[in-house]
């Protein structure tokens, strides 16, 4: 039986009803559960297995029976490892019911049906009912990028109190958290608003005081640190141990701690950021180490370099790849300017039950500090990517070049700015526009831009909650409609075609003069077949892991993905290196002066570079003016011309679209089609890889 769900269509801005099966939420949860790339993590799998074999062998040698408990078993992989390694009994628990049911089938298929599977959270297990006795070996994977964000502290505390013997061993046994202080003009663009200069270097907009004084959000910014361009940051200290977690300790792990470290600068600079990662010791002796460090700090980098066979793989990608455990950036609330190498400062590190945060001081702090939070609306309203966009110099220059020319030629210029948080449109007032109307329906975004306008004494700006607030005489005098475009509801780049929908609404209110200049005037969607080094693993079937058959898991995920995942998903591709396998292909062109026209296009693209096409990257180029100059193009895709066979350098402040083909071997052509129904807010893509003999069919 089907049901209807209300969803927002980002291209139309309307709430629409979509017919969905009763099990849609189930399929969506399965498809997005994220087990896949974890099971492709060969280092994790091998070291967990090695730690289990070693620990169980030592326990049996000591004359102990081994009763293992696997908390959050997922596919059952760790439970099966424990059983095969010689545990006398194995109990596994899994609260996510679709996964638990799948695990039961996987256990049976791998002759491991003797594993006791409990379909509960570990904290709901009742001794004597669900488990006959306590376990003396706990194996679990309860960690995330922050280490403790999935509730590891309380889960381990409960397990030791209720489910484990006093002498129980744990895999992993311990974890150590690391921090490295850094300076990065690039990374700080994701956190604070800079001044907006004109093309001549004069300041057009200054951030108001509340933005300059705001401490920002304490929350982590999780990224693949190894992919930061080496010239974009400087590490100012060596990595320092900040917290240790003993998972084997019977005594409860503290839910809140503060650690103050005295650190020394290796070079002068601004203490702006903390790079964070962790390392686990899987066995009691600490011989099986697994580090999430970026490549430059990875303890096994030299070993990995010697053993790695792919000479074409860049150094940052030699360390084991994983997307479920990344690194994180934390932003210092008030950066410290330190001018001499060897100068010392104090780094304050905090954690609560689920998260961490940091601060820095020139003098040793005496009073405890509260977790900082945003007080300026910027960090509450916009994503890290959006904040970075607002500061992106090259991008801003292209918009400002258009605006300067447009405002100077119009005289007087009356500008309607459409989009959320469009500081560039606001800057048209500072460039000399006679009047500026800014459509800002989001309350926090509008409040932020009002404060910027007030601080910069812009007198001719009016903010609108809706287009209906425009008076007929204002529409009659309009000379320009400008957008980046950017909207808060947008996920994929073409979701910002909502700009076209708003233009149609304006035309319905009152027919606009043909002399009104619209920017961007057009948009183009491009596709590029690529070979990812690693990103494809999030959607690639597992088949087998450490000798265990996981095809039942693959089938479950693939069934759910077909029903719940779109053909294209959003990813920040700068974090996931890929090689181009052809020149970019234009899929669709949109003219915003005539946005309501439906389109259907199709074609076939030859893969001209060697490689396995495991992904198709998509992006939008916005054309600001009708002059066809390359300087009028703002791209959300590659930053440099594409060279087939070479790595692609992607825009770091926007997410691109990605399609993952299901069949990737021995294919030479990419067949594609796309359909745009703008009035319905529908944009669909279809891709299929084909061998050369199929291409003409």
Swiss-Prot record:
Enzyme class: transferase
Keywords: Methyltransferase, Repeat, S-adenosyl-L-methionine, Transferase
GO molecular function, one term: histone methyltransferase activity
E.C. number(s) listed in UniProt: 2.1.1.-
Domain SAM-dependent MTase PRMT-type: 14-357, 366-697
Gene3D superfamilies, sorted: Hnrnp arginine n-methyltransferase1 (2.70.160.11), Vaccinia Virus protein VP39 (3.40.50.150)
Function description: Essential arginine methyltransferase that can both catalyze the formation of omega-N monomethylarginine (MMA) and symmetrical dimethylarginine (sDMA). Specifically mediates the symmetrical dimethylation of arginine residues in the small nuclear ribonucleoproteins SmD1 and SmD3.
Name recorded for this polypeptide: Protein arginine N-methyltransferase 7
Species the sequence originates in: Drosophila virilis (Fruit fly)
Gene behind the chain: Art7
């Amino acid at each position: 039986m089907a049901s209807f769900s209300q969803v927002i269509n980002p291209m139309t801005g309307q709430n629409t009803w979509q017919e969905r099966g009763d099990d849609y939420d189930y399929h969506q949860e399965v498809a997005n559960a994220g087990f896949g790339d974890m099971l492709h993590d060969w280092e994790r799998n091998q070291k967990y297995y090695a730690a289990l074999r070693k620990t169980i062998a030592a326990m049996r040698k000591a004359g102990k029976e081994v009763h293992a408990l696997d908390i959050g078993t997922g596919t059952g992989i760790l439970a099966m490892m424990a059983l095969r390694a010689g545990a006398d009994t194995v109990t596994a628990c899994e609260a996510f019911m679709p996964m638990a049911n799948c695990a039961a089938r996987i256990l049976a298929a791998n002759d491991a049906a003797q594993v006791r599977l409990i379909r509960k959270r570990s904290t709901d297990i009742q001794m004597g009912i669900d488990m006959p006795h306590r376990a003396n070996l706990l194996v679990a994977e309860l960690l995330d990028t922050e280490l403790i964000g999935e509730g590891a502290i309380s889960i381990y505390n409960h397990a030791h109190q209720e489910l484990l013997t006093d002498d129980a061993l744990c895999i992993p046994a311990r974890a150590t958290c690391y921090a490295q202080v850094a300076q990065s003009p690039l990374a700080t663009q994701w956190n604070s608003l800079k001044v907006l200069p004109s093309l001549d270097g004069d300041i057009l907009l200054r951030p108001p005081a509340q933005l300059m004084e705001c401490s920002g959000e304490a929350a982590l910014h999780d990224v693949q640190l190894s992919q930061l361009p080496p010239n974009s940051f400087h590490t100012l200290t060596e990595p320092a141990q900040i917290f240790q977690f003993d998972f084997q300790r019977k005594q409860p792990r503290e839910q809140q701690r503060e650690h103050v470290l005295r650190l020394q600068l290796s070079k002068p600079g601004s203490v702006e950021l903390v790079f964070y990662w962790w390392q686990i010791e899987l066995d009691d002796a600490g011989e099986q180490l697994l580090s999430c460090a970026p490549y430059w700090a990875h303890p096994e980098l030299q070993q990995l370099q010697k053993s790695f066979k792919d000479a074409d793989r860049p150094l940052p990608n030699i360390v084991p790849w994983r997307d479920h455990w990344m690194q994180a950036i934390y932003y210092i609330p008030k950066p410290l300017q330190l001018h001499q190498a060897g100068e010392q400062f104090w780094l304050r590190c905090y954690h609560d039950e689920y998260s961490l945060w940091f601060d820095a001081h020139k003098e040793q702090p005496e009073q405890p500090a509260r977790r900082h939070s945003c007080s300026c609306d910027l960090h509450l309203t916009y994503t890290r990517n959006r904040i970075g966009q607002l500061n992106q110099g090259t991008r801003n220059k292209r918009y400002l070049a258009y605006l300067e020319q447009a405002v100077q030629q119009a005289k007087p210029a009356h500008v309607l700015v459409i989009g959320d948080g469009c500081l560039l449109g606001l800057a048209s007032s500072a460039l000399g526009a006679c009047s500026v109307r800014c459509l800002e329906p989001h309350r926090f975004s509008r409040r932020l831009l009002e404060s910027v306008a007030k601080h910069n004494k812009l007198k001719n700006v009016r903010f609108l909650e809706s287009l209906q607030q425009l008076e007929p005489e204002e529409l009659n005098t309009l000379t320009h409609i400008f957008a980046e475009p950017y909207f808060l509801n947008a996920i994929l780049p073409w979701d910002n075609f909502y700009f076209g929908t708003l233009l149609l609404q304006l035309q319905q209110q009152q027919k606009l003069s043909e002399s009104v200049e619209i920017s961007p005037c057009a948009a183009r969607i491009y596709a590029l077949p690529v070979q990812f080094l690693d990103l494809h693993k999030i959607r690639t079937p597992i088949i087998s892991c450490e000798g265990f058959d996981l095809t039942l898991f693959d089938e479950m995920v693939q069934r759910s993905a077909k029903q719940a995942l779109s053909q294209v998903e959003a990813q920040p591709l700068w974090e996931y290196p890929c090689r181009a396998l052809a020149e970019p292909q234009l899929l669709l062109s949109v003219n915003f002066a005539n946005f309501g026209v439906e389109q259907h296009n199709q074609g076939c693209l030859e893969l001209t570079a060697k490689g396995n096409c495991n992904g198709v990257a998509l992006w939008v180029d916005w054309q600001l003016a009708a002059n066809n100059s390359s300087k009028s193009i703002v791209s959300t895709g590659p930053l440099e011309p594409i060279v087939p066979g070479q790595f692609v350098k992607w825009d770091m402040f926007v997410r691109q679209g990605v399609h993952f083909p299901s069949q990737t071997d021995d294919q030479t052509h990419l067949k594609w089609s796309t359909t745009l129904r703008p009035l319905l807010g529908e944009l669909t893509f279809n891709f299929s890889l084909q061998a050369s003999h199929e291409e003409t069919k």
